[in-house]
Amino acid sequence: MSKNRAASIRARLKNRSDAAKQDFNLTLTHYGLERLLYRLSTSKHAPNFLLKGALLFKLWYVVPQRPTRDADLLGLGPDDIDSVAAVFRDLCVIEVDDGIAFEAGSVKTKTAEIRKEAGYGGGGACRTARDAGRCAALAADRHRFW
């Protein structure tokens, strides 16, 4: 990824954010999440995940929904923290010329008892993304489905 490409993408995102009167940090976060999801879609892990939550609604509806700063994923397969971390580290090393570099070493995971009464848990992963002059943490939650 060239610095000029990253700077160009950042400038276009700034213009889009200004035109929509949207918080620029939210625009950058959404772009980062979308690029993370792109990497997931091109990876060997793609068949094991489904997008859900507010980010999905953003794709379906023209009417703005509540702002979200993470991606909610329904995951199939192992849900132990080490497996979740390995998936996100794999995604971080996929190179795409989109102005973002994800840092595999920055992946941090957490366990969560999500809907414990329903019999499934989950976990989350957070990683650092860098673009032209900006570093941000992006989060994704993975929920287990049986």
Q: What label would you give each PLM region?
A:
Residues M1-W146:
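Compositionally biased terminal segments of proteins
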